[in-house]
Amino acid sequence: MIPTLLLGFGVYLSWGLLGSWAQDPGTKFSHLNRPGMPEGWRLGAEDTSRDPIRRNWCPYQKSRLVTFVAACKTEKFLVHSQQPCPQGAPDCQGVRVMYRVAQKPVYQVQQKVLISVDWRCCPGFQGPDCQDHNPTANPEPTEPSGKLQETWDSMDGFELGHPVPEFNEIKVPQEQQENLLQNLQNDAQSVEDGFPGSWEAPPSNLTDEMTEANLTEFEFPGRTSEHLLQPHIDAFLKAHFSPIWKNFNDSLHSLSQAIRNLSLDVEANHQAIKMIQEGTVARADFQELGAKFEAKVQQNSQRLGQLWQDVEDQLHAQRRSVHHALSDVQAEVSTKLKQLVKAQELPGANGSLVMASAAAAARPEPESLQARLGQLQRNLSALHMVTSQREEELQSTLKNMDSVLKQHAEEIKELYSESDETFDQISKVERQVEELLVNHTGLRELRVILMEKSLIMEENKEEIERQLLELNLTLQHLHAGHADLIKYVKDCNCQRVNSDVDVAPEGHRDVMHTLEETQVSLDEQHQLDGSSLQALQSTVDAMSSAMDAYRGEGERARAERARIRSQLRALDHAVEALKTAANGTRKEIRLLHGSFTALLEDALRHQAVLAALFGEEMIDEMSEEAPRPLPLDYEQIRLALQDAASGLQEQAIGWEDLATRVEALEKAAGGFVEQHPQLAEGLEPSHDSGREEEAMTLAELEQEIRRLSSDVKQIGQCCEASWAASLNSSLEDLHSMLLDTQHGLRQHRQLFHNLFQNFQGLVASNISLDLGKLQAMLSKKDKKQPRGPGESRKRDKKQVVMSTDAHAKGLELWETGSPVAFYAGSSEGATALQMVKFNTTSINVGSSYFPEHGYFRAPKRGVYLFAVSITFGPGPGMGQLVFEGHHRVPVYSTEQRGGSTATTFAMVELQKGERAWFELIQGSATKGSQPGTAFGGFLMFKT
């Protein structure tokens, strides 16, 4: 159909068109990028003697400057990583530092000049239709419109007669196309923008412009033939090329979407891994596995980039080839049409002969054109099939990678949840330690009260002894007076009665007077004796009331001991909870071992998949291009993980052995208490069953505290956390303080019962107390008590001094962290890449937080606890808590709606003068007084 249309179009135009645009058959159109104007057009424009109508249009060159971004080169940079030295390495200094070289593309803004054809009036003509003759008219356009469509102006160096070799050179092996895949999003968009969308004829088409210019004022029937031919050509090209380009554009769009989603997933996984590595203490196998994974991701990114570059080059070459082919087809058709038009100008028989020869010469040309178009269609179909196959393979590869990344994301989420559980357990331990501190403070207060009561009792005892001594002296004086009186009566001389009968009345009066005086003295003596007895009775009553008061205080002390016993039971329950937490930690260790094994299997499977996907030759080639090999291969990693698994199993066995040993020690301690009841009796002389239970409870508490300290030490060694050492030292100090408190309580209880266990007999005896004898008796009783092997009074004094020092050290540890604290909120909004200023300060103890600048400066060296909460605006947001640039804690939110709040905590050791602040790196922070936007911290203890 195409040859028939072309032949009919040529014959039809031979009767209606003029020969103004005819030129030599051997002459071709010049390329659009070449400067200047074709010689035939110049001659046709200057020769106005034949036909002055519609000869006044001439083509001119039009150029414009275009700016674009192109990848000019690749840049190499060093990636620093470090890992701890393996065990047994002789020349290692604790940390092994590795450097590897990575590449990234470098883009540059470039410019190029695009040249097109613009039809204007020929020299010497002007006007809207170029009909006005003006010898002084300027042929160059003063202000180019610049609105011509530039579609075929970049094709160069293609010949229509050889389309098959060009397409054969475009085809490359599948292995080379699958090696590189990076930056498909921007490049795919640029390729889609460069494709012709509507398949309309460009305004710079020479044939269209020429025909349109020459047929403006002629009303020949050949004009309809030109308009009939152009839609057929457009329909043919649209039918053959539009589905191919549409499918190719759709595939590129889907591929770019998949790559974009993959890049987002990789970035999210990278951020999650980074958070876990910063939030927990990385072990050697974690660091090594992370370095391996990062290196593999870098290699895959380089391969993706190279693959995308190859795909872009192939698409560019295909586009150039197709555009060259279509441009040459249009040029050939225009040349043949002009030859036919030129043949129309010859008169008579010569014209018919020339027309016949031209028709005969033009007949085989459409056939060759149809053959070339068919070959072009077949090549494009084959290219479409190959592209579809490779796209399917690429989609399957991307699906596999997506599934692997999802699996890794689930594993990372599990690890993150396990770290949250560990943090909760640590918080529980801290709360229990605080409760123990409160109990210790209560015990200290009770100890002080008991000491005060004992001092008061000592003073009362001395007062009672003094009163008893005075009463004893009074009784002795009374006995002496009574004896003197009896002696005086017995010694009275009665022999002089007879001789003194005469003076009897006077003597009788004297005797009566004397007897009266004696009676008066006796009455006075009886009154004195009665007052002394009343004083003694009142003293005894006071002593009984004092003993009743002491008995009430003893009851209160017994109630206090019951309360302490209940607290000890609660502490026992807390110890059981810690045992349960230790069992949970063992389970977590086993789960981590299973996770490590699964990750090892995934790594080996990924290695096999990469080898099958890219080929052994490509992997060997890329390994040769690498600057240095990796320090470990997969076999060594597998052996290292197996060694770690065996170590974990040995550690679990050690834990079980330790549990059995602790149970044996508990049984032995219980048997020792049963075999030596006199120790409990020495502690409680009143034979109270509740006191014996208290002694046993104290012994069990001591054993549980020792076991708890050993478990905490093992957990600290397992986790290798820097803050665990301070926690272990705090627990040890707490343990020593509890032992000191227990020892002091025992001493005070023993002293109390030794002094007042027989106070009723003391009151009933009604005798004086000799303090010297009492002290001697107590010392003899102490000497009679058996001492254990290796014990001495010097050792007891030494233990008391050591416990006092430990007690003072624990108090100093927990009392020196109080004078620094701050809490501030923010009422101003913030955007990305800036420091968030919390300008509303509610607490600023120590004046170490500066609200006008938004940062906290450490006034002293120590361990600080920080907390930050931020309310993000719409869309995802991310920030980080920065400590003097050497440590960062991320805070992020992935919710699309506004008002989402994210919170994080950090414990860090700061030197004096170091700063801490919060900065926003993505998204925005809401403006206004939000309760969820706050920043605070305090000093825990100095170091």
UniProtKB/Swiss-Prot annotation:
PTM entry text: N- and O-glycosylated. Processed by matrix metalloproteinases (MMPs) including MMP9 and, to a lesser degree, by MMP2 upon angiogenic stimulation.
Gene Ontology CC annotations of this record: basement membrane; collagen-containing extracellular matrix; extracellular matrix; extracellular space; multimerin complex
Region (Disordered): 128-150, 778-801
Signal sequence annotation: 1-22
Residue ranges of every copy of the EMI domain listed in the record: 54-132
Principal subcellular localisation of the protein: secreted
Coiled-coil regions listed: 391-480, 551-580, 688-720
One Pfam family it belongs to: EMI
Disulfide topology: 58-122, 85-92, 121-130
Keyword check for Mitochondrion: no
Key words of the record: Angiogenesis, Coiled coil, Disulfide bond, Extracellular matrix, Glycoprotein, Secreted, Signal
The keyword Transcription appears for this protein: no
Glycosylation sites: 63, 67, 205, 214, 249, 261, 350, 379, 439, 472, 583, 728, 766, 839
Residue span(s) of domain C1q: 815-943
Subunit structure: Heteromer of p110, p125, p140 and p200 subunits; disulfide-linked. Interacts with VEGFA. Interacts with CD93; this interaction promotes angiogenesis. Interacts with CD248.
The protein, known as: Multimerin-2
Lineage: Eukaryota, Metazoa, Chordata, Craniata, Vertebrata
